[in-house]
Every structure is written in structure tokens, then in C-alpha cells.
Amino acid sequence: METTATSTHEFSDATRVLTSVLAPLEKRTLLWLAARMPRAINSDHLTALALAAMAMAGLSYWWARYSPFGLAAVIVCLAINWFGDSLDGTIARVRQHQRPRYGFYVDHVVDMFGIAFLVGGMGVSGYMHPFVALGLLATYFMLSAEIYL
């Protein structure tokens, strides 16, 4: 006898709460950027940019093992990640192209891969012991599972 479970829970939109000192400035900046972003660029493009920037940040940490310019490259990559990761949801809301479940899922999956690239790069950089990086990554994943679920 086969039974199917049905969920009685409704998916509700999450309210984005910015609480940092720079939150008002960040919100105004993101809205300004979203209003001026070319129509050909959508939220998926910005999400991909954010992931690529995190991968490059990880590679830049590896490069820092051989050259101090790698650390400067990490900073640039993290700024590009902020641009893509913060602006993807903003542009979707401004253009009324929200996909709450899909967007929530993709955002968090991309964040998981991004942090793996970043912390992996730290672990091979020589600036952090690989076991410390592994512990940091495991802790991040456990805390993320607690928060997202």
C-alpha cells in the first residue's frame, strides 16, 4: 500500500533584512545599479558572475602562495562577488521577475559552492592550515544547514 505525504505548509516569501551600519547605503546603491543595468543582463547572469568571482577568489588565494598580488586579486574578486550576489535578487525584484523558491534554492546552492572555492583556496594558500580550512568549511556547512532548513 503506497501513501503519499502532502505538505500543509505554505511557502512564504522571506523578508530581506539588512542590519549593518552601511545597510541604507547598500540598499540605495543596489537600487541605483538595478535601475541602470542593461535589460540583456538578468539575475541568472549576476548569480553566475558571483559564483565565478568566488572561484577566482579561491584561485587567487592559491596564487597568493607564490605572489602577494594574489591577495589583492582576492579583494577584487570578493567585490565582484558582492556585486553579483547582492544585485541578482535586487534586479529580479525591481523588474518583477521574482522566482521565490527557485531563487532561494539557487542562491544558497551557489553560496555553498562559492564558499567551498574560497575556503579551499585559503587551505592551499599557505596562510591557513588545510585542516583549519576543512574545519571552517564543515562548520559553515553545518550552520548553513541549520539556518536554511
What are these regions (language model features)?
Residues 1-79:
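Topogenic membrane-insertion module of multi-pass membrane proteins
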Residues 1-37, 108-149:
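A feature for the membrane-embedded catalytic helix bundles of lipid/isoprenoid biosynthetic enzymes
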Residues 56-66, 85-87, 120-124, 142, ...:
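Structural signature of transmembrane alpha-helix termini at the membrane-water interface
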Residues 60-62, 68, 103-106, 125, ...:
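A generic membrane alpha-helix/interface feature
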Residues 68-75, 101, 130-134:
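The feature captures the transmembrane alpha-helix scaffold of multi-pass secondary transporters
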Residues 76-120, 146:
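Acidic (Asp/Glu-rich) catalytic motifs at the cytosolic membrane interface
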